[in-house]
Amino acid sequence: MERPVSSSAPTAFTPAGGYGDTSRSRYERELPAQILSDDEALADGVPDLRGTWKVAALLVNGVAAPADHHLWAHFERIEQSGNRVIVVGGGVIHDFASCDGTLENGLHDVMAIDFTTPLQVAARFDDGVLVMRPHGMPVEVKRWREGEQLVWEYSIAFTARLNRIA
């Protein structure tokens, strides 16, 4: 059975070894070409998270992260169409075909940590927040807008504030 996908673009996946020059750190790789069209409408009630974002503030376990923490180098692009969200960053392309809260229509890809460990994630929008729930893990990953910034919260591990760079 084919998964429902918002937009005419086929489901995108992380290539073997991650996207870009695999001899470079996952934070130094050039983002691949945009997958979705800029002119595709969002579904009713879906917040606009689109753009390319760079970490500007970082708390780890509630404390300001040291300058050498790897997440300071993180940048990502979020693409949206209808109820579909694609997060491209850190070497991975995470395409949520439909953010309807089901694993079936969620992400089926690999983890950024090694580009090989399978990852399934259900996602949905709750009161303007994109809430992602990885299968078999007791965590939630959230993204939402606060003014001009994007907030990225990874359970209790870290909270990053990102500024739009494109």
Set out the residue ranges of the language-model regions:
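Edge beta-strands of extracellular beta-sandwich domains
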Residues: 159-165
